[in-house]
Amino acid sequence: MSSYIVHRQNITRKEQSTIYWVNVLLSMLTGLLLVAIAWPISWFYHLPQLGGLIMLTSLNFLVLGSLSQYQAHFIKAKRMILLAKIEMVTKFLAFAFTVILLYYSPLGVSAVILGLFANAALRIGCMIWFGDKSWRPTFEFDQGTFYSSLKYGIYQLGSQTINQLRTQADSLIVGKVMGAELLGVYSLAKELILQPLKLVTPVINRLALPRFAEKQHDPVRLQQLFLKGTFVIMLFSAIMYLAIGILSPVIVRVLYGPAHEAVGQLIPLMLLFGMLRPMGGLTGAISQANGRTNVEFYWNVVASIIVVLVLASVWIWPQVEYVALTLSISQVLISVFAHPFFIKPVIGIRFLPYARQWISVSAVFVGIIALVSHYNLFIMPEWFSRWL
């Protein structure tokens, strides 16, 4: 719901306060829900200590609702550099706090959870201190804003939930069809592909969301921004994943050790998936900026159907290499079908201008990776045997 503030460019103090208190209330209700289910979960898993840890985790929700609102204000005001500085400093302080607790107290896992809470509390404290006073909420409520922001937030939450389930569908099938051993190999390869996305996607959203929101009433300029953004992101993503692909034998040896070199055989098959996936951050940002989270939700349903249909073929070819390849196949299909189901309804761009931004880059990327794989042009760990 925090991105609703960015979408609503001109918002009154009363409307802003309404969104703030609704977000805080929902955050606290989520925390109470965690407290309520803590003991049933610990009983189900026969781990008595788990209940206390889950209840301790609920502390985070005391500040997360407020934190997300202030973060949205920083993004809307394009104060990303200050926001990044706050996050780096508070993460370092929270890390130091966690290490001290682990070293000088018997808290164990609880120290890590308290470290997360300390990080959130420090961040909101710094954001309040460095943020504008006009961002601070008042005790006012606007019913119209409440309903519109709630509708916006529910669709966005639904989209994120479906997206997470879709991301894990392949792992469920590998575990069911091929067993735990191959699931372990597959999961390590996929995690290596996903890790850069966890860093890149939030940056894309933070940079794109306020700019798209500013131009939401200027369709021509919005289309130009989207097309330019797509091309730049694809170019950056292609270079990043090309480097990961060529260095994959070394990366696997360093991260997983020589016993898991089978992981490296799956990575080239997943590279196109990783390269194309950052486009999802851009499409998500443009739907949120235009207040079209309902279209984003329905598109995620369609994308999930595409993934399930492609994954269904795994029962015909139950090979872990084929499952790795289906990730890339699914992402290509999602990139194509995103146009009629999502991009055209939201910003009205024709297919050819959209396709030109990523198909040519993807074709060159696939060609280079194919040549590297065919002629075994990977950088090998044996070249660095003195250090590895």
From Swiss-Prot:
Pfam families: Polysacc_synt_3. One of its GO terms (biological process) is polysaccharide biosynthetic process. It is found in: Cell membrane. It is a multi-pass membrane protein. Coiled coil: none annotated. Its main location: membrane. Pathway: Glycan metabolism; exopolysaccharide biosynthesis. The keyword Membrane applies. Keywords: Cell membrane, Exopolysaccharide synthesis, Membrane, Transmembrane, Transmembrane helix, Virulence. InterPro entries: Poly_Biosynth_Transport. It comes from the Bacteria. GO terms for cellular component: plasma membrane. The chain crosses the membrane at residues 24-44, 47-67, 97-117, 231-251, 297-317, 359-379. Involved in the biosynthesis of amylovoran which functions as a virulence factor. Belongs to the polysaccharide synthase family. This is Amylovoran biosynthesis protein AmsL. It comes from Erwinia amylovora (Fire blight bacteria). The lineage of its organism: Bacteria, Pseudomonadati, Pseudomonadota, Gammaproteobacteria, Enterobacterales.
